């Protein structure tokens, strides 16, 4: 019996592998040094950094931080042991990654985003929706609710009456459903929270000022609702009781069957109209001063503005500055 031994295989490391091994070794050494110096466990340092960047904007070339434990992200560059801003915008931190989000930039959609859009074009079995991104979003006929909440396949008759659902110029609130390789996205309105917008005022603010949170739909005092979408489109409207009630979904669908695609606004009393105007002015005041837009900031700004009973007084820059200082304290 003859036994054939398999020759040993030798792996020759390439120059890139050697460089990677050296880089990993250096990185491990740096981490060990940081641990010995107490930098890795510096939660207090992270909290202090968050406080220092809160509500702050940076300009190109401005030092963001010189703390060695932070890593640079988009909108920054490393020089002389510090992280500097390469664009004008707001500083954001994810763990120890520091980035600067530009103030003037197109909205970049992400799956699950709550957005407000405007119907730009009606095509066969789909709508093109302007959401403030580089490309229009696509809303398929199969991605909407039919009147009455009926769950069935969309027929040719539905395609023929697409303009009775949405037509050019209509505003809607939807959710980003899918992201395609070319950068375009598809959206859907298959929820009672989404659909055509009525009974309100449309505003446009820089998307960078909208702070992402778990919820972007708020109910304020005075019978006013706000939809603060992440693409920088804001809707201030009359309070919708169905949206915040605990009635069953089936009951709500039956009640909304006739009004879900209506083009007529409901009757709005004068008190609510004034509150809608006041909230709209407050949002514009925050945006014009490059202040972050959140439920808390809008509420504080609104409450501080109540010292001026006349809405015309809110348009005076001096008064707006005073309100902003009180609201952000």
Curated annotation (Swiss-Prot):
Signal peptide: none
SUPFAM superfamilies noted in UniProt: Eukaryotic type KH-domain (KH-domain type I) (SSF54791), Nucleic acid-binding proteins (SSF50249), Ribosomal L27 protein-like (SSF110324)
Subcellular localization, as worded in the UniProt entry: Cytoplasm; Nucleus
GO biological process: CUT catabolic process; exonucleolytic trimming to generate mature 3'-end of 5.8S rRNA from tricistronic rRNA transcript (SSU-rRNA, 5.8S rRNA, LSU-rRNA); nonfunctional rRNA decay; nuclear mRNA surveillance; nuclear polyadenylation-dependent mRNA catabolic process; nuclear polyadenylation-dependent rRNA catabolic process; nuclear-transcribed mRNA catabolic process; nuclear-transcribed mRNA catabolic process, 3'-5' exonucleolytic nonsense-mediated decay
Domain S1 motif: 110-190
Coiled-coil ranges from the UniProt annotation: none
SMART domains documented for this protein: S1 (SM00316)
Subunit structure: Component of the RNA exosome complex. Specifically part of the catalytically inactive RNA exosome core complex (Exo-9) which may associate with the catalytic subunits rrp6 and dis3 in cytoplasmic- and nuclear-specific RNA exosome complex forms. Exo-9 is formed by a hexameric base ring of RNase PH domain-containing subunits and a cap ring consisting of csl4, rrp4 and rrp40.
UniProt record similarity statement: Belongs to the RRP4 family.
Protein name: Exosome complex component rrp4
Organism: Schizosaccharomyces pombe (strain 972 / ATCC 24843)
Lineage, broadest ranks: Eukaryota, Fungi, Dikarya, Ascomycota, Taphrinomycotina
């Amino acid at each position: 019996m003859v036994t054939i031994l398999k020759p040993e295989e030798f792996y020759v490391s390439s120059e890139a592998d050697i460089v990677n091994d050296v880089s990993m070794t250096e990185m491990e050494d740096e981490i060990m040094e940081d641990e010995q110096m107490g930098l890795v466990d510096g939660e207090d340092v992270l909290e202090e950094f968050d406080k220092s960047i809160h509500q702050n904007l940076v300009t190109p070339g401005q030092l963001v931080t010189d703390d060695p434990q932070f890593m640079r992200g988009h909108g920054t560059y490393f020089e002389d042991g510090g992280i500097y801003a390469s664009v004008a915008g707001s500083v954001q931190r994810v763990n120890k990654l520091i980035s600067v989000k530009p103030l003037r930039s197109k909205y970049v959609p992400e799956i699950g985003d709550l957005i407000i859009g405007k119907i730009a074009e009606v095509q066969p079995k789909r709508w093109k929706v302007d959401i403030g991104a580089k490309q229009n979003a696509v809303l398929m006929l199969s991605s909407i609710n039919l009147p009455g909440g009926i769950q069935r396949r969309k027929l040719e008759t539905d395609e023929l009456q697409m303009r009775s659902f949405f037509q050019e110029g209509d505003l809607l609130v939807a959710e980003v459903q899918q992201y395609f390789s070319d950068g375009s996205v598809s959206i859907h309105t298959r929820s009672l929270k989404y659909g055509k917008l009525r009974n309100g005022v449309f505003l446009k603010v820089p998307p960078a000022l909208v702070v992402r949170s778990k919820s972007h739909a708020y109910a304020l005092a005075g019978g006013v609702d706000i939809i603060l979408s992440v693409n920088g489109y804001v809707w201030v409207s009359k309070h919708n009781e169905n949206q915040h009630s605990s009635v069953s979904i089936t009951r709500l669908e039956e009640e909304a069957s006739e009004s879900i695609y209506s083009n007529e606004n409901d009757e709005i009393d004068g008190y609510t109209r004034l509150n809608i105007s006041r909230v709209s002015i407050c949002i514009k005041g925050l945006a014009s001063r490059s202040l972050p837009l959140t439920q808390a900031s809008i509420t504080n700004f609104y409450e501080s503005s109540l010292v001026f009973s006349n809405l015309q007084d809110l348009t005076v820059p001096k008064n707006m500055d005073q309100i902003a200082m009180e609201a952000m304290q």
